[in-house]
Amino acid sequence: MKRPYKRKRKRGPVQSKKVSYDGINFASGLERYMYMALKNAKIKSKYEGETFVLLNGFHFENEVYERCANGKGEYKNRGCKRILPIKYTPDFIGDGFIIETKGRANESFPMRWKLFKQLVMRQFPNTTLYKPQNQKECDETVRLILSYLK
């Protein structure tokens, strides 16, 4: 007996699955792995503990002719609006370090990451940034943090 054709849903560029562990909802399995590695090494950190404003919001008073952000809709004046701030929430914040686990970056991440690096350099000069992209790099990150804490 032939199975009926099942149409696959189109997925976006980021294909991470949401995972729960210890009562915390993680955005990906890699974030959960990092949390477990930090916990096993007894390194204190907060998961998504703080949100940083990379660029303040403002009121755009000029006229601007464009379509909606999704490229649809009518081409018309969409100016004179409040522009929202650009914010960034790293995955883990600890004493002297910030960790951003990133499997596959989305479209806006590279720009946010550069702006965040600039903010850290100016406001937190003695903070080390880590961006592990797989479990091996998560383990290496924990090793580096432990050697730094000694």
For the regions a language model picked out, list residue spans one by one.
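Electrostatic, structured charged patches in enzyme active sites and in nucleic-acid/phosphate-binding
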Residues: 1-150
